[in-house]
Amino acid sequence: MMQLRHGIFDESSISVIALDTVHEIGRLAGRSLDARRFRPNVVVRSLRSAPFQEDQWLGGVLSFGEADDAPAVTVTMRDIRCSMLNLDPDSATPAPEVMKAVVRANQNNAGIYGVVTRIGRLAVGQIVLLRAANEKRERG
């Protein structure tokens, strides 16, 4: 992860979505969805199986790894979706039922945006921890 002053992004420097959210939107739209359709920087597989759980992460900090100097993102806002998510990432075939499902299920929001608060390297399979913004990291 790195911090950019300028870049190509929608609202914030990092977008994150949970697989449970992708699967629920697919279920509601009546089709299997690829997470790439949502153009996230990070896809999270949560131990807590709940669609749209990212809404509860607002104001929190996602730490990528357990080290004290692990890369971190402060969650700043819900990801308001545009019609681009109707397009299949491989074929560009439109499926308007996808956007309709997001609107009906979660007020047109799917995933979150955040800002990088600690730079570092991310890896597939890495543990992601959520903590309150003012919570100190403690070793137990």
Residue ranges and their predicted role:
Residues M1-G140:
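Metal-cofactor-dependent catalytic cores
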